[in-house]
């Protein structure tokens, strides 16, 4: 089996960016004159791409409508990250997929991560990092000695010294989502805690920094990284 498809979540509202950006969909905010999502499309360029659109989705659709490598999956009502994925999976035949947030970027060896996923016959692989200074808006992951995920806590107020941070990139077997219907649910809060109980879910730690565009300050940091 091989991985051929990547889902990118592009429905974020960017509520903390309202003073900075009132008109553009969050993933289209320009970083050094380039829409942020272009960095993700380059990272996952070897795969067929599905963009999950929601808030201001028509902007993303207009931008990529003529791109033959991109499938557009629109949510007509708010679905959350989990619902957006389930909605997109209805149009995807592949059994293995990559999923990425559309407003954050983490540089890592993607081929190595997919090799581990396939060789170990993992059901759900979360890319994680120990390269972070504060919790910010990221989920914390606790693993055992074999890197199997023991617990996941989205946006905790504190974390243990040994916890890892979720990078917002996942490799998964489609079947882990089989019991979920299209609804307003969260991948991080609703789905991941449940699949940890029933599937082989592992962390792949990459030691890389995560760059996101959640605040004006983080946008400046991302601009310096992508120069």
PLM segments and residue spans:
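Conserved N-terminal catalytic core of the sugar/cofactor nucleotidyltransferase
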Residues: 1-8, 30, 34-101, 105, ...
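N-terminal nucleotide-binding beta1-loop-alpha1 segment
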Residues: 1-22, 200
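Hydrophobic packing residues within well-ordered alpha-helices of enzyme cores
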Residues: 17, 60-64, 222
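Conserved beta-strand segments of alpha/beta enzyme cores
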Residues: 27, 48, 69-71, 148, ...
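Catalytic-core segments of class I nucleotidyltransferases/pyrophosphorylases
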Residues: 98, 105, 111-118, 132-133, ...
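A short, conserved acidic/glycine-rich loop-to-beta-strand motif
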Residues: 120-130
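Short acidic-glycine loop/turn motifs at beta-strand connectors
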Residues: 142-148
């Amino acid at each position: 089996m091989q991985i051929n498809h990547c889902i990118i979540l592009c429905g974020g509202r960017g509520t903390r960016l309202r003073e900075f950006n009132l008109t553009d969909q969050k993933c289209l905010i320009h970083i050094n004159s380039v829409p942020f999502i272009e960095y993700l499309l380059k990272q996952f360029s070897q795969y067929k791409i599905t963009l999950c659109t929601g808030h201001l989705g028509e902007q993303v659709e207009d931008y990529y409508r003529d791109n033959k490598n991109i499938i557009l999956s629109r949510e007509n009502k708010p679905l959350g990250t989990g619902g957006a994925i389930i909605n997109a999976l209805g149009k995807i035949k592949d059994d293995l997929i990559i999923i990425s947030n559309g407003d954050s970027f983490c540089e890592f060896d993607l081929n190595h991560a997919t090799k581990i996923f396939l060789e170990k016959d993992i059901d759900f692989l979360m890319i994680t990092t120990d390269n972070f200074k504060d919790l910010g808006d990221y989920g914390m992951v606790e693993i055992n000695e074999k890197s199997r995920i023991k617990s996941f806590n989205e946006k905790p107020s504190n974390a243990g010294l040994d916890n890892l941070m979720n990078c917002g990139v996942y490799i998964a077997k489609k079947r882990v989502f089989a019991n979920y219907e299209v609804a307003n649910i969260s991948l991080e809060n609703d789905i991941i805690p449940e699949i940890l109980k029933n599937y082989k879910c592992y962390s792949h730690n990459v030691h890389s920094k995560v760059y996101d565009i959640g605040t004006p300050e983080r946008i400046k940091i991302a601009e310096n990284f992508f120069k």
